[in-house]
Amino acid sequence: MSLHQERKSELVSKFRTHESDTGSPEVQVALLSERITMLTEHFKTHKKDHHSRRGLLKLVGQRRRLLDYLKSKDVARYKKLIDGLGIRK
């Protein structure tokens, strides 16, 4: 499952830090969160798809590492990102 190009560019433009930014932690976390959401919806109908579930767990771990990195570097950017994505309480 991949993101559609329109949705991907929409996320990049929303979370980028400067005009040509496509690889900052904010953008990467936003793209990973969208893929995680898509896979979560997939598992509501395909409960026994354990192969894809492993991929989901890898994505969640990668997002966690990026969030930890961002939190250690700049707490304000971290808080803005999690508020924008709605992924923490």
From Swiss-Prot:
Keywords: Ribonucleoprotein, Ribosomal protein, RNA-binding, rRNA-binding. CDD domains: Ribosomal_S15p_S13e (cd00353). Residues 1-21 have a biased composition (Basic and acidic residues). The keyword Ion transport does not apply. It holds the Pfam family Ribosomal_S15. One of its GO terms (biological process) is translation. One of its GO terms (cellular component) is cytosolic small ribosomal subunit. Residues 1-25 are annotated as: Disordered. GO terms for molecular function: rRNA binding; structural constituent of ribosome. It comes from the Bacteria. One of the primary rRNA binding proteins, it binds directly to 16S rRNA where it helps nucleate assembly of the platform of the 30S subunit by binding and bridging several RNA helices of the 16S rRNA. Forms an intersubunit bridge (bridge B4) with the 23S rRNA of the 50S subunit in the ribosome. Belongs to the universal ribosomal protein uS15 family. Part of the 30S ribosomal subunit. Forms a bridge to the 50S subunit in the 70S ribosome, contacting the 23S rRNA. This is Small ribosomal subunit protein uS15. It comes from Myxococcus xanthus (strain DK1622).
